[in-house]
Amino acid sequence: MPVPPLPLHVPAVGWSPDLRALRILDQRLLPGAQEVRDLVQLEEIVEAIRTLAVRGAPAIGVAAAIGLVVALEVDSGGQETRARALLADYAARLQRARPTAVNLGWAIDRLVRTAHRTAVGSMLAALRAEAEAIRAEDVAMCEAIGQHGLAVVPDGARVLTHCNAGALATAGIGTALAPLYMAHARGRALTVYADETRPLRQGARLTAWELSRAGISVSVLPDGAAASLLSQGLVDLVIVGADRIAANGDVANKVGTYGVALAAAAHHVPFYVAAPGSTIDPHTATGRDIVIEHRDADELGELPPGVPAWNPAFDVTPRALIRGYITDRGFVEPPFTLADYAGR
């Protein structure tokens, strides 16, 4: 069936119309303002990723790929020798922007490998083509995740999700929200509960915004109410995205995901993870090996003077709590190998 249209006026991440810049929808300003930004300088691209102007593992990968290309083109003046000299440094600076999301490193690695195998005189064109391939693949992977995920989203489903893994987190219709968009397009009635997702409120600001724009019934709840909601039998399934999936099936996702998974298990509600193959990292053995990014204390609001903060951006949900993994290749089971990982 036709793919449902994006609930956004423009994709969250992609090329500018003239193909000379990285275009993003600045998510720091949502839902109050919709501001599109065109970026070409490496530092502003790194800053956009680091400050969550563009966020979501797949979207970060696309942003890094396009951003690396346009920054190299601008700063080299189109001179390949200069671009090759800048490549390693620019790639490393982008990879350091957010360490937990595997798609960022995956996309940069693809471009670096492309540069190394490309003949002299055609590197910049080859990098541009590879970045576009990464963007187009993400759109297709989102659609495939949505199609496969329809199997667990029946008519009348009541779904809980955490953070934002929708169109705002990808170049397409999302990962965790893709099956919901597909189900809605088929006329299935849905009730969605979106965790607020403190401290940056991605669920309240972003998930609720894009679902409501698509005409899907959505309610926001404080993070601390998720267990109560599950205990009252008001949820049929939980679907979340992922920033990195270890070889054994452990999943790093927005902090608070682990608590939702524990509550879902306690109340016998199936818990699914939706992610493209590019988010599976067979080189990371378990969740204990995943580097967890910590954010600044000022994200937590005003604190008493001298009181420190512990503010991890992600937590790790063990494989034992996960009913299934919905990927662009269908439902998969760990242990994961290179064959499960797109582009490795």
UniProtKB/Swiss-Prot annotation:
Signal peptide: none
Reactions this protein catalyses: 5-(methylsulfanyl)-alpha-D-ribose 1-phosphate = 5-(methylsulfanyl)-D-ribulose 1-phosphate
GO biological process entries: L-methionine salvage from methylthioadenosine
An example molecular function term from Gene Ontology annotations: S-methyl-5-thioribose-1-phosphate isomerase activity
Active site (UniProt): D243 (proton donor)
Keywords tagged on the record: Amino-acid biosynthesis, Isomerase, Methionine biosynthesis
Pathway involvement of the protein, from the record: Amino-acid biosynthesis; L-methionine biosynthesis via salvage pathway; L-methionine from S-methyl-5-thio-alpha-D-ribose 1-phosphate: step 1/6
Site annotation Transition state stabilizer: residues: C163
One Pfam family here: IF-2B
Domain of life where this protein originates: Bacteria
Keyword Membrane: no
Record bears the keyword Cell membrane: no
EC number(s) recorded for this UniProt protein: 5.3.1.23
Sites where the protein binds substrate: R55, G56, A57, R98, Q202, N253, K254
InterPro entries, alphabetized: IF-2B-related, IF-M1Pi, IF_2B-like_C, Initiation_fac_2B_a/b/d, M1Pi_N, NagB/RpiA_transferase-like
Family indicated by similarity: Belongs to the eIF-2B alpha/beta/delta subunits family. MtnA subfamily.
Function recorded in the entry: Catalyzes the interconversion of methylthioribose-1-phosphate (MTR-1-P) into methylthioribulose-1-phosphate (MTRu-1-P).
The name this protein goes by in its record: Methylthioribose-1-phosphate isomerase
Gene source species: Gemmatimonas aurantiaca (strain DSM 14586 / JCM 11422 / NBRC 100505 / T-27)
Taxonomic lineage from the root: Bacteria, Pseudomonadati, Gemmatimonadota, Gemmatimonadia, Gemmatimonadales
